[in-house]
Structure formats: structure tokens, C-alpha cells
């Protein structure tokens, strides 16, 4: 694989060892029916919030036809309203309120995600959990197509969520490895 | 030791007198006396002119130091002491550099921060879609206004000369003829060669002599001609706006303009709010943008979903046969999605991708419509694949909307269970009844034997 010709916009780019791991997991996801192939279907999984991570091919020509996927992956935000009650939630709400007044981003060990608290005008509030979807580039679209069991090259694919799947732990390890590339 | 200091106005070089204590920094006479000389001189020439051989240069950025060492053979150093030294220099910058004070430094810093932020966000200030959105809205308003005015002109002048509406079909030509002619009596002596063809002109002059409608007063005629001036003025404005929109679209979205034309492209951008938002949509959404009401109605009543929205007015879809419009619309939407992403994330003004995609689509259109006898089987296979693809595309939106319906169906299924149970009880009762009849018959036979 020629590293010199890779587009600098393809970031984060996996090295050869991590690429093999990613393609192997993509193939297993194909067998377990947990894979969406193609940039279009990957876009839909991000819009629906059922994507675990996104794999893209760095030798796509032109590369701009899949640069909207990192934008969508980083933009995924889950919002919900929390109802105040006299219980554990009440204590959590008080803590979040204090964090909001100090202007800091609260990282709660219970949720293991970044939580922001927005105090609304009608004395209620809205909690936003920011959970980015990891994305990674692999060097070859031909290899990605073979991993997806498709005869044609595949420029993007998305591994979807399934709580009861046997791939859960492998997916979590790979997500951690992908996020290490961004450091 | 020398110290390279970077400010928003340029570079500065200082000499360290006492390297042991790293104090008593002194000006080396490297002030920038005029902005002209500062702007022309680059870092390369600046360092070459001022650094002697064997000098050690302290830098704030180790990567920059590596580049300087590589290209100029000047030894660079970067450590905590250098950072402390630079912090001290920054706090006393206005004193060390003569002719520079805080009032001069603030606007230069502001300009530099704007340029840096724009570079980081990759925003080009000339790629602003607000003008396109407003232009396409204004174009629609001009269209409506022009229609209203031309209808009024035809109605008013029709009282005087009703045959003219049949002779001159075009609205703009009609307004020009009315403005030139005035009273229909003048038609016989005027020359319409600049506006109309010879046959139409002869027909007009013949009709003007045999028309038997009412006469028009001078005041009414003046009002009608002023209305014609309005019509021609609006038509001219509309033409200028179309040209301007074409130029803007070729600048902001060249690939999309090459594929679907500037009007349809502008409507797509206007519908989504910006090119950035449009680039994040899958092509199946782009295909039916502008037909949301029809889509939701079809999903609610479980009918066929629409095949096109705003994209119906693209030239490629319009010139296709009715049975092929759906296929061409789907292919065009897919290629348009790729073109939109190239326009949004690419920095160049290149429309090669759009032109190539358009050529492929035109070839496919010819292939669909010019069916040879030898290619009938291939066409049938292609049609089958397209039908399956259409079914797959239609299923996905339904799954999103039908989740509520599935819950209702689940409730209905739970309701149906007692019905099944009652049916089973009925069957059991019937069996019991048959058994009872058999027993009665058996006893009757026995009694007869006895």
C-alpha cells in the first residue's frame, strides 16, 4: 500500500495492523447482518442513530463524496428531558444544576458520557448527551468491498448496533482503538 | 543566542546578552520601520540576513525550528527557559519595539484571528448561499407579478382589439405590439417588422381593419401603455436576475449546475437552507425533496410514494418519456448527491465530475428509449432490477412511519387471541355433541335387540 499518495483529508487513517482488524470485524458484521454498505445507507444509519462506527476508504476518487460522513458522525446528539423526582435522579439533577451554573461540562460516572445541562426559560431544563460516532479511514476500497462480501469496491460502510450481538465486546474494543488515533 | 519572536504584525529577532541568566534582552535594530518593507520580506530572507554562522536560535515552535534547521543550517533550541523568555518578551513587546504600541497591535491581531478562524473552519467568504436563496425567491415573485400584469394587459386591450390575443401568442411580444400600435386604426400604417414576422404582421393588419369592437379613449390607451411598460420592465429584470443566478450557481455549485441546471440547483439549496445541509442528505431524500406532503399522505394511506419532487423540472427528467421519468429521476438524484458533496467539500471550481455524470445519464436515457429488438431481454432484466430497487427504496421510509402502526397491529393481535380460543371451544363442543348422539343411537339399538 502506497502511503505517499493518500489524501491528507482522509483522517484518521488506520495503519496496516488496525486496518486488518477493522476489515475482519466488518466481515464478521456482514455475517451477523450488522452492516450497512455504501455511503447512502451509512448516512441513513447516522441519521437514525443506530450506527456503532463508520469505515471509509481513503483511496476514493474524489474523496469529497464521503466527507459528509465525518460531519454527521460528529454531530450526533441525543436529547431528552429529565423528570424531577425524589430519588436518585433528584440528586443527579442537583449536581447537574451546579455544574451548569459553573459553566463546566459535567462528566458523570453513572452515564459514562459527556452531559450538558441547559436551563430553559420555563424553569425546566433539557439534558443533552453528546455521543460522537467514531469514524476511520482504511487505505483500500477494494479490500473494503471484499470484507463486505461485495464484488464491487465499497467506499463507506457502517456497523450497526445490536445489544444482543456476540460482536459487542469486539466492537467496543475497536471503537476505543479508533478513538486513540485521534489523540 | 538569538530569539525569534512571532507577533501578529510580523517577526522580531532579539539578542540575548547574558545567556547564563537569560535576562537583559536588547533590541537588535530589527524594527519594521514601514509596513511595506515588512510585508515584502519573508522569514527565509529575514533569517538569512540577520543570523551569523554558529549562532543558536531560540524558537517557540519545535516544528518550525526543525524546518529552519533543515533549510538554513541554523541550530534551533526549544525548552522551558526559552518559553519563559518569550513570555517576558511578550509582556514588554511595546517597549522593546520602537514605534509600536497597543493601539496599533490590536487591529492587526484581530485581522489575523479572523483569517486563522476562516482557514480552520474552511469557510470561503465567497461561497455564501443566502444570495442564491433570496434570488430564487425573488425570481418566483417576479414570475407571478409578470403573469398578473400580462393578464391585465390582455384583458384591457381585448375590449378594444380581441383578435390580437389569437394572432400574437407570446406575452412579451403582445406588450410590445400594444405599446407600438396604440389605437388599432394605426396598425395599417405602422411597421411591425422589428417585433413580428411578415405573415403575422399581415394577419394583424388585416384583422385591425375588420374588427368591430368598441373604440378606446386616449386616457385608457395611456394607462394600457404604461402597464405595457411595467410588463417589459419586469421581464427585463427577470432576465438580468436569471443571468446573475446562473453566474452565482456556477461559482458556488458548478457540478450540481452542470447536472440539473441552475434553477433546479438553486431550488434544492433554497429548500435545505444551505449547500452544507444539502450535502448531508442521502440521494433518496434528494429525489423527493419538494414532495413531502405527497410522501406523508402516501405513507399514511399506504399508496405509492412519489418518484420525484423538485428534481422533476431538471432538463434530463423533462426530456425523458413518461415511463422512464422515474428511472432517470432516481439516477439523476444519485449523481446529484455526489456532485453536491464535491461542491460542498471541494475547494476548486472544477465541474468535470458533473459533466461526466451528465454524459453518462444522457447515454442511459438514449439506451432506455431507443430499444432495439436484440436488446429486449437485457431491457427486461434491467427493468426487473429497477423494480426490485424501487420496492426496496419504498420499504425503508415505510418502516420509519409504520412503527406506530405495528404497535396497533400488535394490540389487534392480542385482541384476536380470544376469538381463536372461542373458535377452539366451538370445535370441542361440536365433538362432544357428536359423541353424545352416537351414545344415544347405541342405546336405542340395544333396546330394539332386547
Curated annotation (Swiss-Prot), chain B:
Residues 375-423 are annotated as: Disordered. GO terms for biological process: ribosome biogenesis. Keywords: Nucleus, Ribosome biogenesis. It comes from the Eukaryota. Gene3D superfamilies: 1.10.287.4070, Nop domain. It is found in: Nucleus, Nucleolus. SMART domains: NOSIC. GO terms for molecular function: snoRNA binding. Its main location: nucleus. One of its GO terms (cellular component) is small-subunit processome. It holds the Pfam family Nop. SUPFAM superfamilies: Nop domain. Residues 252-370 form the Nop domain. Belongs to the NOP5/NOP56 family. This is Putative nucleolar protein 5-3.
Amino acid at each position: 500500500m502506497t502511503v505517499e499518495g493518500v489524501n491528507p483529508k482522509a483522517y484518521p487513517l488506520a495503519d496496516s495492523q488496525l486496518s486488518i482488524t477493522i476489515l475482519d470485524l466488518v466481515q464478521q458484521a456482514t455475517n451477523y447482518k450488522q452492516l450497512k454498505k455504501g455511503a447512502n445507507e451509512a448516512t441513513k444509519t447516522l441519521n437514525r442513530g443506530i450506527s456503532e462506527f463508520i469505515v471509509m476508504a481513503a483511496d476514493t476518487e474524489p474523496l469529497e463524496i464521503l466527507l459528509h460522513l465525518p460531519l454527521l458522525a460528529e454531530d450526533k446528539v441525543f436529547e431528552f428531558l429529565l423528570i424531577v423526582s425524589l430519588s436518585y435522579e433528584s440528586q443527579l439533577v442537583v449536581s447537574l444544576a451546579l455544574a451548569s451554573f459553573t459553566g463546566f461540562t459535567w462528566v458523570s460516572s453513572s452515564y459514562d458520557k459527556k452531559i450538558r445541562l441547559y436551563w430553559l426559560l420555563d424553569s425546566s431544563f433539557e439534558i443533552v448527551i453528546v455521543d460522537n460516532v467514531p469514524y476511520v479511514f482504511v487505505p483500500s476500497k477494494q479490500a473494503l468491498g471484499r470484507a463486505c462480501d461485495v464484488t464491487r469496491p465499497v467506499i463507506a460502510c457502517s456497523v450497526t448496533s445490536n445489544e444482543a450481538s456476540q460482536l459487542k465486546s469486539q466492537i467496543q474494543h475497536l471503537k476505543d482503538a479508533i478513538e486513540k488515533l485521534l489523540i | 543566542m538569538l530569539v525569534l519572536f512571532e507577533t501578529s504584525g510580523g517577526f522580531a529577532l532579539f539578542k540575548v546578552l547574558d545567556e547564563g541568566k537569560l535576562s537583559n534582552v536588547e533590541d537588535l535594530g530589527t524594527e519594521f520601520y514601514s509596513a511595506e518593507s515588512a510585508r515584502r520580506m519573508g522569514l527565509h530572507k529575514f533569517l538569512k540576513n540577520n543570523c551569523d554562522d554558529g549562532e543558536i536560535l531560540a524558537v517557540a515552535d519545535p516544528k518550525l525550528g526543525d524546518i529552519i534547521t533543515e533549510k538554513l543550517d541554523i541550530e534551533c533550541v526549544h525548552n522551558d527557559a526559552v518559553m519563559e523568555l518569550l513570555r517576558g518578551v511578550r509582556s514588554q513587546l511595546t517597549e522593546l519595539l520602537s514605534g509600536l504600541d497597543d493601539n496599533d497591535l490590536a487591529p492587526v491581531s484581530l485581522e489575523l484571528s479572523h483569517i486563522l478562524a476562516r482557514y480552520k473552519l474552511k469557510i470561503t467568504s465567497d461561497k455564501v448561499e443566502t444570495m442564491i436563496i433570496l434570488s430564487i425567491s425573488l425570481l418566483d415573485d417576479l414570475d407571478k407579478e409578470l403573469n398578473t400584469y400580462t393578464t391585465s394587459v390582455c384583458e384591457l386591450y381585448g375590449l378594444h382589439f380581441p383578435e390580437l390575443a389569437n394572432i400574437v401568442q407570446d406575452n412579451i411580444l403582445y406588450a410590445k405590439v400594444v405599446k407600438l400600435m396604440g389605437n388599432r386604426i394605426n396598425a395599417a400604417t405602422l411597421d411591425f417588422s422589428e417585433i413580428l414576422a411578415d405573415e403575422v404582421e399581415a394577419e394583424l393588419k388585416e384583422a385591425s381593419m375588420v374588427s368591430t369592437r368598441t373604440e378606446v379613449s386616449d386616457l385608457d390607451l395611456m394607462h394600457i401603455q404604461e402597464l405595457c411598460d411595467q410588463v417589459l420592465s419586469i421581464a427585463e429584470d427577470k432576465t438580468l436576475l436569471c443571468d446573475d443566478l446562473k453566474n452565482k450557481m456556477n461559482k458556488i455549485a458548478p457540478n450540481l449546475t452542470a447536472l440539473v441546471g441552475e434553477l433546479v440547483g438553486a431550488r434544492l439549496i433554497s429548500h435545505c437552507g444551505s449547500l452544507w445541509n444539502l450535502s448531508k442528505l442521502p440521494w433518496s431524500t434528494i429525489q423527493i425533496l419538494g414532495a413531502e406532503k405527497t410522501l406523508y399522505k402516501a405513507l399514511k394511506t399506504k399508496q405509492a410514494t412519489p418518484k420525484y419532487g423538485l428534481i422533476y423540472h431538471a432538463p434530463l427528467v423533462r426530456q425523458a418519456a413518461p415511463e422512464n421519468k422515474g428511472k432517470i429521476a432516481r439516477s439523476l438524484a444519485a449523481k446529484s448527491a455526489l456532485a453536491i458533496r464535491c461542491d460542498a467539500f471541494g475547494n476548486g471550481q472544477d465541474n468535470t465530475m458533473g459533466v461526466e455524470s451528465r454524459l453518462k445519464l444522457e447515454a442511459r436515457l438514449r439506451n432506455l428509449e431507443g430499444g432495439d429488438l436484440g436488446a429486449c431481454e437485457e431491457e427486461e432484466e434491467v427493468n426487473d432490477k429497477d423494480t426490485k430497487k424501487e420496492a426496496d427504496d419504498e420499504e425503508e421510509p415505510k418502516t420509519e412511519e409504520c412503527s406506530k402502526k405495528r404497535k396497533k397491529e400488535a394490540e389487534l393481535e392480542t385482541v384476536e387471541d380470544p376469538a381463536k380460543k372461542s373458535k377452539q371451544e366451538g370445535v370441542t363442543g361440536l365433538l362432544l355433541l357428536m359423541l353424545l348422539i352416537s351414545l344415544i343411537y347405541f342405546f336405542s339399538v340395544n333396546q330394539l335387540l332386547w
